[in-house]
């Protein structure tokens, strides 16, 4: 059973190949994700991952961790992209259960999510809600 304070953590190293592959698969051809020369001349100073890339890693952690308790689906997420993720970054993905609202056929679970880089800088925050189902 999911409990308030339950935490899910995962650490992931991000490579240039990861960034290019994800951007290509989702047809995001923004040169910030593909062209080192172009990206170097921008305020970012080099290649960066697209926001959905590292958000999807966080969502994958949510799904794989909390489905250990039974079926669940995401129902609402508010996301803040704060800093870029770059090739060579090692990011920590984290979810913490903050509230559980009982319903007749399950629960609505509220969670705080975050991603920090190897320097301890927060690169993404989110508040999400999932619906769990009684089995």
Task: State where each predicted segment sits.
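Catalytic strand-loop segment that frames the active site of acyl-thioester-processing enzymes
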Residues: 1-49
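Generic structural detector for well-ordered beta-strands
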Residues: 9-13, 80, 129-131
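N-terminal hydrophobic or amphipathic segments with adjacent small-residue motifs
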Residues: 17, 39-40, 45, 82, ...
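Hydrophobic beta-strand-centered segment that forms part of the acyl-chain substrate-binding groove
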Residues: 42-46, 55-96
């Amino acid at each position: 059973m999911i409990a308030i304070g339950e935490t899910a953590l995962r650490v992931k190293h991000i490579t240039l190949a990861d960034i290019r592959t994800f951007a290509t698969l989702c047809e995001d051809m923004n040169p910030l994700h593909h062209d080192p020369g172009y990206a170097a001349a921008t305020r970012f100073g080099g290649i960066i991952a697209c926001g959905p890339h590292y958000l999807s890693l966080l969502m994958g952690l949510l799904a794989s961790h909390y489905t250990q308790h039974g079926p669940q689906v995401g129902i609402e997420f508010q996301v803040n992209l704060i800093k870029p993720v770059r090739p060579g970054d090692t990011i920590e993905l984290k979810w913490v259960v903050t509230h559980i609202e009982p319903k007749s056929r399950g629960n609505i679970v509220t969670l705080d999510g975050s991603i920090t880089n190897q320097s301890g800088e927060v690169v993404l925050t989110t508040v999400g809600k999932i619906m769990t189902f009684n089995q």
